[in-house]
Protein backbone atom coordinates (compact mmCIF):
# COMPACT_ATOMS: atom_id res chain seq x y z
CA UNK A 1 0.00 0.00 0.00
CA UNK A 2 0.97 3.64 -0.53
CA UNK A 3 -0.13 5.95 2.29
CA UNK A 4 -0.64 9.66 2.85
CA UNK A 5 -1.84 11.42 6.00
CA UNK A 6 -3.84 14.56 5.29
CA UNK A 7 -3.38 18.02 6.77
CA UNK A 8 -5.28 21.28 6.80
CA UNK A 9 -3.20 23.02 4.08
CA UNK A 10 -2.93 20.04 1.78
CA UNK A 11 -3.36 20.42 -1.98
CA UNK A 12 -3.82 18.02 -4.88
CA UNK A 13 -0.15 18.06 -5.86
CA UNK A 14 0.75 16.26 -2.63
CA UNK A 15 -1.14 13.34 -4.16
CA UNK A 16 0.12 13.69 -7.73
CA UNK A 17 3.75 14.71 -7.27
CA UNK A 18 6.06 17.66 -7.72
CA UNK A 19 9.47 18.76 -8.89
CA UNK A 20 12.16 18.37 -6.22
CA UNK A 21 15.54 20.15 -6.18
CA UNK A 22 18.63 17.97 -6.43
CA UNK A 23 22.11 18.56 -5.05
CA UNK A 24 23.40 19.61 -8.45
CA UNK A 25 20.74 22.30 -8.80
CA UNK A 26 18.47 20.34 -11.14
CA UNK A 27 14.72 19.93 -10.59
CA UNK A 28 13.55 16.32 -10.91
CA UNK A 29 9.93 15.18 -11.02
CA UNK A 30 8.99 12.89 -8.09
CA UNK A 31 5.75 10.89 -8.23
CA UNK A 32 3.29 11.42 -5.38
CA UNK A 33 1.40 8.54 -3.73
CA UNK A 34 -1.56 8.65 -6.12
CA UNK A 35 0.66 8.52 -9.19
CA UNK A 36 2.65 5.63 -7.70
CA UNK A 37 -0.58 3.71 -7.06
CA UNK A 38 -1.89 4.47 -10.56
CA UNK A 39 1.33 3.16 -12.11
CA UNK A 40 1.86 0.06 -9.96
CA UNK A 41 -1.57 -1.18 -8.91
CA UNK A 42 -0.94 -0.45 -5.23
CA UNK A 43 -3.69 0.36 -2.74
CA UNK A 44 -3.71 4.10 -2.00
CA UNK A 45 -4.56 4.67 1.68
CA UNK A 46 -5.53 8.24 2.61
CA UNK A 47 -5.52 8.68 6.40
CA UNK A 48 -7.49 11.38 8.28
CA UNK A 49 -9.29 12.38 5.10
CA UNK A 50 -11.42 15.14 6.68
CA UNK A 51 -8.30 17.01 7.83
CA UNK A 52 -7.89 18.18 4.23
CA UNK A 53 -10.05 20.98 2.76
CA UNK A 54 -13.13 19.79 0.90
CA UNK A 55 -11.99 21.36 -2.38
CA UNK A 56 -8.96 19.04 -2.48
CA UNK A 57 -11.19 16.00 -2.82
CA UNK A 58 -13.63 17.71 -5.17
CA UNK A 59 -10.63 18.27 -7.46
CA UNK A 60 -9.95 14.53 -7.19
CA UNK A 61 -13.40 13.36 -8.29
CA UNK A 62 -11.97 12.22 -11.62
CA UNK A 63 -9.45 10.06 -9.73
CA UNK A 64 -12.22 8.55 -7.63
CA UNK A 65 -13.99 7.65 -10.88
CA UNK A 66 -10.86 5.74 -11.92
CA UNK A 67 -9.86 8.11 -14.71
CA UNK A 68 -6.29 8.52 -15.88
CA UNK A 69 -4.12 11.05 -14.07
CA UNK A 70 -3.08 13.92 -16.30
CA UNK A 71 0.12 15.43 -14.92
CA UNK A 72 -0.21 18.99 -16.13
CA UNK A 73 3.34 19.86 -15.07
CA UNK A 74 4.92 17.18 -17.30
CA UNK A 75 2.20 16.48 -19.87
CA UNK A 76 2.19 12.77 -18.97
CA UNK A 77 -1.07 10.79 -18.94
CA UNK A 78 -1.04 7.81 -16.55
CA UNK A 79 -3.98 5.38 -16.80
CA UNK A 80 -5.14 3.68 -13.62
CA UNK A 81 -3.75 0.19 -13.07
CA UNK A 82 -6.69 -2.25 -12.86
CA UNK A 83 -5.64 -3.35 -9.36
CA UNK A 84 -5.45 0.16 -7.89
CA UNK A 85 -7.90 0.95 -5.11
CA UNK A 86 -8.36 4.06 -2.95
CA UNK A 87 -9.17 3.77 0.76
CA UNK A 88 -10.01 6.74 2.98
CA UNK A 89 -9.74 6.39 6.76
CA UNK A 90 -11.05 8.81 9.35
CA UNK A 91 -12.25 8.98 12.92
CA UNK A 92 -15.26 11.08 11.91
CA UNK A 93 -18.03 10.55 9.34
CA UNK A 94 -16.83 12.13 6.10
CA UNK A 95 -19.81 14.45 5.93
CA UNK A 96 -19.30 15.70 9.49
CA UNK A 97 -17.02 18.69 9.88
CA UNK A 98 -17.79 19.27 13.55
CA UNK A 99 -15.10 19.23 16.20
CA UNK A 100 -14.85 17.38 19.51
CA UNK A 101 -12.21 17.44 22.20
CA UNK A 102 -10.60 14.53 20.36
CA UNK A 103 -10.55 15.44 16.68
CA UNK A 104 -9.95 19.07 15.74
CA UNK A 105 -9.68 20.94 12.48
CA UNK A 106 -12.01 18.65 10.54
CA UNK A 107 -13.82 19.61 7.32
CA UNK A 108 -17.20 18.40 6.13
CA UNK A 109 -16.70 16.89 2.68
CA UNK A 110 -18.66 17.67 -0.47
CA UNK A 111 -21.61 15.46 -1.37
CA UNK A 112 -20.08 14.75 -4.79
CA UNK A 113 -17.08 13.14 -3.07
CA UNK A 114 -19.18 11.17 -0.58
CA UNK A 115 -21.25 9.84 -3.48
CA UNK A 116 -18.13 8.21 -4.93
CA UNK A 117 -17.29 6.24 -1.77
CA UNK A 118 -18.42 3.12 0.00
CA UNK A 119 -18.84 3.84 3.72
CA UNK A 120 -17.84 1.16 6.22
CA UNK A 121 -17.86 1.55 10.00
CA UNK A 122 -15.06 -0.40 11.69
CA UNK A 123 -15.68 -1.52 15.25
CA UNK A 124 -13.18 -2.80 17.77
CA UNK A 125 -12.55 -6.57 17.81
CA UNK A 126 -14.40 -8.79 20.27
CA UNK A 127 -12.92 -9.03 23.75
CA UNK A 128 -11.06 -12.32 23.32
CA UNK A 129 -9.75 -11.27 19.90
CA UNK A 130 -8.54 -7.95 21.25
CA UNK A 131 -6.79 -9.61 24.18
CA UNK A 132 -4.90 -11.88 21.77
CA UNK A 133 -3.98 -8.98 19.47
CA UNK A 134 -2.64 -6.91 22.37
CA UNK A 135 -0.79 -9.89 23.83
CA UNK A 136 1.01 -10.54 20.55
CA UNK A 137 2.23 -6.93 20.59
CA UNK A 138 3.41 -6.85 24.22
CA UNK A 139 4.38 -10.43 25.08
CA UNK A 140 8.07 -9.65 24.52
CA UNK A 141 7.83 -7.02 27.25
CA UNK A 142 6.59 -9.61 29.75
CA UNK A 143 9.98 -11.32 30.07
CA UNK A 144 10.56 -11.95 33.77
CA UNK A 145 6.85 -12.04 34.59
CA UNK A 146 4.71 -15.12 34.99
CA UNK A 147 2.89 -15.55 31.68
CA UNK A 148 -0.48 -16.07 33.33
CA UNK A 149 -0.02 -12.95 35.42
CA UNK A 150 1.00 -10.87 32.41
CA UNK A 151 -1.95 -12.09 30.34
CA UNK A 152 -4.30 -11.25 33.19
CA UNK A 153 -2.97 -7.69 33.21
CA UNK A 154 -3.76 -7.47 29.48
CA UNK A 155 -7.22 -8.91 30.06
CA UNK A 156 -8.04 -6.43 32.82
CA UNK A 157 -6.86 -3.44 30.79
CA UNK A 158 -8.84 -4.51 27.71
CA UNK A 159 -11.98 -4.86 29.81
CA UNK A 160 -11.37 -1.44 31.35
CA UNK A 161 -10.95 0.08 27.87
CA UNK A 162 -14.16 -1.57 26.67
CA UNK A 163 -16.09 -0.17 29.62
CA UNK A 164 -14.80 3.33 28.81
CA UNK A 165 -15.68 2.95 25.12
CA UNK A 166 -19.21 1.82 25.93
CA UNK A 167 -19.82 4.83 28.17
CA UNK A 168 -17.64 7.48 26.56
CA UNK A 169 -20.46 9.70 25.31
CA UNK A 170 -22.05 10.18 28.72
CA UNK A 171 -19.55 9.44 31.45
CA UNK A 172 -16.05 10.26 30.25
CA UNK A 173 -16.32 13.54 28.35
CA UNK A 174 -16.38 11.84 24.92
CA UNK A 175 -13.08 10.03 25.56
CA UNK A 176 -12.30 6.59 24.25
CA UNK A 177 -9.21 4.40 24.65
CA UNK A 178 -7.54 3.29 21.44
CA UNK A 179 -5.54 0.11 20.99
CA UNK A 180 -2.42 2.29 20.96
CA UNK A 181 -3.45 3.59 24.37
CA UNK A 182 -3.94 0.04 25.63
CA UNK A 183 -0.47 -0.91 24.41
CA UNK A 184 1.13 2.02 26.23
CA UNK A 185 -0.86 1.37 29.42
CA UNK A 186 -0.01 -2.34 29.48
CA UNK A 187 3.66 -1.68 28.71
CA UNK A 188 3.93 0.68 31.69
CA UNK A 189 2.12 -1.76 33.97
CA UNK A 190 4.55 -4.51 32.94
CA UNK A 191 7.47 -2.21 33.78
CA UNK A 192 6.01 -1.42 37.20
CA UNK A 193 5.23 -5.10 37.82
CA UNK A 194 8.88 -6.02 37.20
CA UNK A 195 10.32 -3.13 39.21
CA UNK A 196 11.89 -4.20 42.53
CA UNK A 197 10.49 -1.04 44.13
CA UNK A 198 6.95 -0.10 43.12
CA UNK A 199 5.86 3.54 42.81
CA UNK A 200 2.94 4.78 44.85
CA UNK A 201 -0.40 4.19 43.12
CA UNK A 202 1.23 2.47 40.11
CA UNK A 203 -1.97 1.87 38.16
CA UNK A 204 -3.16 5.48 38.35
CA UNK A 205 0.37 6.65 37.55
CA UNK A 206 0.54 4.38 34.50
CA UNK A 207 -2.85 5.57 33.27
CA UNK A 208 -1.81 9.19 33.67
CA UNK A 209 1.54 8.81 31.91
CA UNK A 210 0.15 6.84 28.98
CA UNK A 211 -3.33 8.32 28.41
CA UNK A 212 -5.02 10.57 30.97
CA UNK A 213 -2.46 13.37 31.31
CA UNK A 214 -2.94 14.26 27.65
CA UNK A 215 -6.68 14.86 28.08
CA UNK A 216 -8.79 17.70 29.39
CA UNK A 217 -9.16 17.86 33.17
CA UNK A 218 -12.74 16.58 32.97
CA UNK A 219 -11.80 13.68 30.72
CA UNK A 220 -8.79 12.73 32.84
CA UNK A 221 -10.91 12.75 35.99
CA UNK A 222 -13.53 10.62 34.26
CA UNK A 223 -10.94 8.03 33.27
CA UNK A 224 -9.39 7.91 36.72
CA UNK A 225 -12.84 7.48 38.25
CA UNK A 226 -13.65 4.71 35.79
CA UNK A 227 -10.44 2.95 36.76
CA UNK A 228 -11.70 2.49 40.31
CA UNK A 229 -14.05 -0.26 39.10
CA UNK A 230 -11.13 -2.39 37.88
CA UNK A 231 -8.40 -0.86 40.02
CA UNK A 232 -8.27 -3.58 42.69
CA UNK A 233 -7.89 -6.41 40.17
CA UNK A 234 -5.20 -4.67 38.11
CA UNK A 235 -3.34 -3.42 41.19
CA UNK A 236 -3.20 -6.88 42.75
CA UNK A 237 -1.62 -8.25 39.57
CA UNK A 238 0.92 -5.42 39.32
CA UNK A 239 1.92 -5.50 42.99
CA UNK A 240 1.98 -9.28 43.25
CA UNK A 241 5.35 -10.56 44.43
Give the label of every model feature segment:
Residues 1-155, 159:
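AAA+ P-loop NTPase catalytic core and its hallmark functional loops
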Amino acid sequence: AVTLTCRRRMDKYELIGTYMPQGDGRLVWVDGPALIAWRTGAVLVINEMTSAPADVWVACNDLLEGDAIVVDRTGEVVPRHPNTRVIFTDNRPLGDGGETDQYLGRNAQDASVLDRCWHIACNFPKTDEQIELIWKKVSHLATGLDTGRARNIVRQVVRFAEEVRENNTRAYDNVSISNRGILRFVSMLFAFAKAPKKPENPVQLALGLTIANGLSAAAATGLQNALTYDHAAILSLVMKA
